């Protein structure tokens, strides 16, 4: 039995609020159960130096957690003067996943900057961030079209992207781990896929006990099922 009482293949309650903030070109509040993340997509003229005069745009991501998004307050990374390795890893994951969904040539020499701010954490913050940010990007691209930054016929969005966590908890593969499960799981895996059914990234780690190829296949099957439900629900 899972702590939440959910079935092994059951997602948490999923809710999306578009236009959650006033100023960003695209903004979404995404909620997976008690995990809540604000995802914004800001359009900035120009590109980094390594993209200058390439005719292509760029997409990059930042990720952070509010001090009391977790059970115990933690100091802001800005106050510590250094990002943690975890934060840097998650930022790179979000950026990689989302760049796979956008035709950077089609947005011209503009940069889409993603900000994912966790306001409440209960497991799965990185996967919620990816899913919410993909929705925010779609809204930002629509904003660009409506405001003459892109031709209305342009289609920079190659696909949508969603992500979910799976794992082995009490020797059973489970979908969409909350904090209680994640902190006690024998295996934790994050799966990122696009709306075309393609796999973008898989991160899987055994926690003190290895997992078999059969267990991997079961977890991947759960992830595919969950992501399909996410696309059907919020995209």
Curated annotation (Swiss-Prot):
In alphabetical order, the GO MF annotations are: 3'-5'-RNA exonuclease activity; tRNA binding; tRNA nucleotidyltransferase activity
The EC number(s) attached to this protein equal: 2.7.7.56
Q: Which reaction does it catalyse?
A: tRNA(n+1) + phosphate = tRNA(n) + a ribonucleoside 5'-diphosphate
Q: Does the keyword rRNA processing apply?
A: yes
Record bears the keyword Nucleotidyltransferase: yes
Pfam families per the record?
RNase_PH, RNase_PH_C
Identify this protein by name: Ribonuclease PH
Q: Which organism is it from?
A: Francisella tularensis subsp. mediasiatica (strain FSC147)
* HAMAP family, alphabetized: RNase_PH
Q: Which CDD domains match?
A: RNase_PH_bact (cd11362)
| Subunit relationships | Homohexameric ring arranged as a trimer of dimers.
Q: Which UniProt keywords apply?
A: Nucleotidyltransferase, RNA-binding, rRNA processing, Transferase, tRNA processing, tRNA-binding
UniProt lists the family membership as follows: Belongs to the RNase PH family.
Q: Which NCBIfam families does this UniProt record tie to the protein?
A: RNasePH (TIGR01966)
**Tell me, what does this protein do in biology?**
Phosphorolytic 3'-5' exoribonuclease that plays an important role in tRNA 3'-end maturation. Removes nucleotide residues following the 3'-CCA terminus of tRNAs; can also add nucleotides to the ends of RNA molecules by using nucleoside diphosphates as substrates, but this may not be physiologically important. Probably plays a role in initiation of 16S rRNA degradation (leading to ribosome degradation) during starvation.
Which positions bind phosphate?
Answer: 86, 124-126
GO BP, one annotated term: rRNA catabolic process
